[in-house]
Amino acid sequence: MAKGLSLARAFYQAGHRVIGADFEPYGVPVNGRFSVVLSKFYSLSRPNSKDGATHYIQDLLSAVRREKVDIWVSCSGVASAVEDGQAKEVIERHTRCRAIQFDTKTTATLHEKHSFIQHTKGLALPAPETYDVTSRTAVHNILNDAEDVHYILKSVGVDDASRGDLTLLPRPTLSETYQHVANLKITNDSPWVLQRFIPGEEYCTHALVVDGDVKVFVACPSSELLMHYEAMHPRSSLSKAMLKFTQEFVARSGDGMTGHLSFDFLVEESASEKGLQKVLYPIECNPRAHTAVVLFDQHAAEMAEGYLTALAPEINGAVNGLKHRIVVPAKPAKYYWVGYDLVSLVLYPLIRIFILSPGSVREFIEGCYLFIQHLLFWKDGTYEMWDPLPWWWLYHVYWPGQFLACILQRRNWSRINVSTTKMFNC
């Protein structure tokens, strides 16, 4: 993952010895293992339904003991977030290593959409109208009472097939609504949440929290599949509002939280006598590192120092004699992934030209312009001139290996996230 590689490079640039560990699906080596910043790399067992996270946690514990690790920075994906909470408890119980990871209970609460919203409301913080539903009947009962309000159905679990479905409910006609809901598997074992649709711009944040203090923070515009990163100015009103929400959330949650905390926000605008009012609604929480960490490329040493405060005692708000301040990217580059842009902006529009799709020529020209602009003035989220091999391996070995595995196993996928190396099944 790009976020893990970015963090590894940050610690390396700050003068630390860095050990890497990751899953290697289908036996294809991940690109991060070839980075010059790693002193050693460990391939981890992936949690599964048969053995749970037992082997995964044991692999991590063995690596921590063997390498005498001082601090473990979790960089989990959506599918192993809770397992990392379990690993944190085991590692800190059996070693002196400090984990940058929430405990199992906190991770599970924040990871699930419905429990996160309930927790947020319990903290007396704003949250969108959200309902837990375990049957189609429950969905229709709520929709039938809705007046001038639309909702979006979201699966509570990890469901790649429905993740990109942002269908507004109710549909224009009753029959369309019933037909859409009928195609969804909504049961007690497969619960969903019905969340009020908030028209407005979407934003995401990334924060490092150590012992209840926000050490690192950034906010940026977001989308359903975010592949272009541009940090908001830290002094902008929206960025400050999202930072304040994060700090309030951490303070009210108590227990000296330590881990990564990322929120997805929607901003609702409404007119009033005082002018245009903006209301910030958190719609989802990711209790793990966010890819937006790449935006701290120019602040590697400062960011690494934020993590190391987990090892240092704090006296009167100061660590190692230095007063704490929140690290934010001052003038970061804009980030993209060349493989994604090449396909989405150039190759896909080119294919549409050959099949004579309407507007394809204009789409191709505009796409080429954007691609060249990104190539010249933006920064690739994986490439570094002094550490080029991970970038080369990602596109020439890792992804071809993944595509070949899908063909051999006849596994269908609908899209990929190049930055997280996630393939969305369908």
Where are these regions (language model features)?
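A short beta-strand motif that forms the metal-chelation/ATP-contact edge
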Residues: 207, 216-218, 275-288
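Peripheral (often C-terminal) accessory segments that flank ATP-dependent C-N-forming ligase machineries
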Residues: 305-426
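A long amphipathic alpha-helix within ATP-dependent nucleotide-binding catalytic cores
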Residues: 183-189, 227-279
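Gly/Ser/Thr-rich active-site loops/lids in small-molecule metabolic enzymes
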Residues: 239, 291, 297-309
